[in-house]
Amino acid sequence: MPLWLQGVVELGSVAVVSYLLILLTVLMVWLADGFDSLGLTGGFVLSGQVWLLAHLTPLQVALDPGAGLPATTGTVNLVPLGLTLVPFVLAWHAGRRLARACWEGQFWQPYLSGLAVYSAAGAVAALLFGTGEIAAGPAAAAVFPLVPVALGAFVGAYRASRSLPGLIGVNAAAWVERTSQYSRWAGSYVWAVLRAGFVAAVAGVGAGAALLAAALLWNWNDVVNVYQRLGTGVPGDTALTGLQLGYLPNLAVYALAWATGAGFEVGEGTHTSPLGTQTGPVPLLPALAALPPGELPSWSAAVLVLPVLAGVLAGWWFLREGENHLDDWMAIRLPARWITFPLSTLLTGLFIGAVAGVLAMLLSWLAQGSLGLGRLTVIGPEGPDVLLWFGAEVAVGAAVGCVVGPWLEREPPFAPLRGGASGEDPGDGSGAHLGRAGRREARRRRRAEAAARRAMRSAGPAGGAGSSAVARPAQGRGVADAEAPEPVGAFDVDAPAAPSEVRGSPER
């Protein structure tokens, strides 16, 4: 099968399967008399509208006053992120299969052809499932669904191939090798800061999810009372629970925003945060029964420590990476450690906090939105507020994590080396018995050996094909199945040891 056609089949299947999963859920509720006046055709239309909303496509709402409701026009763009994960995960697996079927540098062929078909499917869905009350613009439906699918397919392909040169045919490592030593240190430092910020964001979302679970358990009686007051029966309760599960990731992001101090809104005039709550009428949904009361206890401000702890975890992770080349560079330029160490630690904390704040702001923008009706036009946190609050708290925690990180390690900084001063690992190869200095020396030696192997392949008779990061597959093997070189970390090159490796660990 041609690669472009395989991309069409794979991503076209993602569109069909994701729609069928939503349709199955709607039909189950319909068969249980959950939608009295919907009808079978209405079930297909409602499933298509939910499919578009799950793909980040805004829906235009225009209620007819003849249906017993006040005339209202608005935009529904409160995306159920739980349903957005469905096409993302399906595209992840499709990207893995496409990566295994491609030669080096050919992934863009099935990738672009599949995305073109997915864009056309979104435009067709907008035309088929639009009604007089709810509709989506064909142009928006052709663009927005590409976001979760393109991201999922690319991430899945990268996870399968573990090589950007194998996917796009551009060897960034070869370009980095031609730069100066300071440029290589800067690249390694920036890459480590980006990953540390991602660690802080993931830890923050996890803390928000734990806070949401604790709030639901604490207010479980109120949640059950709302179900009983609604009196929708088993079919209605099932549909309502499914709706809330679709918005569960949104609620976790709201809990994160609440823990940072930025807070969030549930309609115009209703804002809640640990520093104060402005009460107002809220929709009668069971999950909203876990909202904090108007009068908060004095200890509620203690939740502000959760983002700080996420920053401490990110700072500790950054320290364990051993890529603090900003501190190395400052130590070379200015020998006064009582100045360079606090300054580099503060700057690193600020950089990690900025990355984590930007990621949290993006999550807030995805989780917030409008239902287009009445007061429910503003739901969720404000992205800039989350950026400032979460970024500042993570920055403080990351600086603390970089300082206390050495005391969190199990082995002392100057543990005796059984393998001698060279840092060799004479044991089982795990390096668990080596001290920090020994592990750094062993890591430097492995990097040098990997660089030497790359140089030998570049000088071999195979020419340019032997110097690529992923060799051309033999006997029908794809990019993901080809034997890749030993991973040596981002921006690893044949370079002299960093100053931190020469000086050893600082004294406690």
Where are the regions a protein language model picked out?
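Alpha-helical transmembrane segments of multi-pass integral membrane proteins
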Residues: 105-168, 213, 217, 312-425
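N-terminal membrane-targeting/anchoring modules of bacterial envelope and secretion proteins
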Residues: 1-229, 234-238, 407-416
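Generic hydrophobic-segment detector
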Residues: 134-138, 142, 146, 187, ...
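Long, glycine/tryptophan/cysteine-rich extracytoplasmic
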Residues: 1-85, 128-129, 225-308, 365-508
